[in-house]
Curated annotation (Swiss-Prot):
Family according to the record: Belongs to the TRAFAC class OBG-HflX-like GTPase superfamily. HflX GTPase family.
Cellular component per GO, a single term: cytoplasm
MF terms (GO), sorted A to Z: GTP binding; GTPase activity; metal ion binding; ribosome binding
Tagged with keyword Metal-binding: yes
4Fe-4S keyword on record: no
Amino acids binding Mg(2+): T207, T227
UniProt-annotated location(s): Cytoplasm
Cofactor: Mg(2+)
Keywords: Cytoplasm, GTP-binding, Magnesium, Metal-binding, Nucleotide-binding
Name of the protein: GTPase HflX
Self-association and partners: Monomer. Associates with the 50S ribosomal subunit.
Domain Hflx-type G, chain residue ranges per copy: 194-371
Function noted in UniProt: GTPase that associates with the 50S ribosomal subunit and may have a role during protein synthesis or ribosome biogenesis.
Amino acid sequence: MAKVAVWKPSILVLPRGLARWEVREAYVLAETAGYRVVDVLYYRRVSSSKLLSDAKLEELAEKAKSLVGNEYARIIVYDNLKPREYFRIVKATGVNTIDRTMLILEIFSLHAGSREAKLQIELARLRHELPLVREAIRLSKLKELPGFLGPGGYAIDAYYRYMVSRIAKIKRELRELRRRHEIERSKRRSAGLPHIAIVGYASAGKTSLFNAITGLQKPVGPEYFTTITPKRRAISFNGLRTVFIDTVGFIMRIPPEIIEAFHSTLEEAATADVILYVVDVSEPDTVIAEKLDEGLQTLRRIGVIDKPLIIAANKIDLVPQEDIERLTRLLEGAASTLYPALEAVIPVSAKTGAGVAKLLCRIATLLAGTKGSTC
C-alpha cells in the first residue's frame, strides 16, 4: 500500500533584517523537515526577553486560526525561543510551536542512521527542551499551562525527572562511543594513515566531492544535512594512502546545544591532519563570504585554528570561466584573515571532476611536507 504524505502546514515567523539568502534558507529548512509554509510573519524583537509585541502576537494568532486542531501543523519561529516566550505563543495561538533549534534537530532526525547520531540528536533535543519543561512546571503550579509539545505523554514532573536521567545515560554512552572512535583513530594513525576532514557549509557539495575523491556513491541532494554520521574511506593517490572523512555541514548561528551534542562528530575536524573546506562558488559573492566566515568561526569554536586548510572552490561548472580566478582571489582574501593556516584555494567541480586531480596533488604535496607546489 502506497504511503500517503502527511499535510504539515506551517507559519514561518522570521526576524526582520535577514539577508535574502537567509530567508531562502529558512524556507529550505522548513521544507526539508517536511513542512509546507502557508504563511509568513516578520517581526522585530521587542527586547531581550520579549520576542513579539502584543500586536504581532495578535497578528500571528489570526494567521494561525486555520491551523488550530491540526496535530501536524507548526508555527516555526526562526529564532531561539526562551521558555516564557514559547508558552506565550502557544497560549495565544493554540498551535504547536518549534524554534530554529528544534527545526534543525527534526531535519537531523530524518538523516540519522547510526546509533551515535540518534543519541546525539536526542541529547541536543533534551537539553533544549529542559528549560521549557522547567517553565511548564512553574506554569502548572500557577494553573496557566496551555499545553506542552503536543498531547499525551508523561506528567510534567515525571517527564522532567526522566529527562535528567536520560541525559546522564546518553552522555555516558556517548563518552564510550567517543573512546572507541579515539581507539580507531589511533589504530589508523599507527598504520601511518593521515586524516583529511571534509568540512563546509551545508549543501556546499561536501559529500559529492567525497564521492568524487573516493569513488563511492554516498547519497547526495540539494537538501541540507544529508550527512549526519561521518563517512570514512581510505584511498591511495599520488603515492600516499590517506583517510578522507565527510562531516556534518555548518549552518549560520549553529545552536550551542548542537555543537555540544555533536562534539565527537565535529572532533573529526579537530583531530585531522588537513582540513578540506568545501565552498559553493556558484552563489553570490556576499553569500560566499558570509558562509565562509560562519564556517571558519565554527572551526575556531571547536578548537581548529592551526590545522593546514585547503579550500575546494566547488561547483565551477556553474560559474563562467572568466570568474574563476576572481572567485579564487575572493576566497583567499576572505579566509586568510580569519585562518592564517590557509594553504591554498583550488577550483573544482565535484560533478564533472574538473580540478579534483590538482586538489589531490596539492594535498599530497602538503602531507609530504614539500615546500611550494608543483601541482
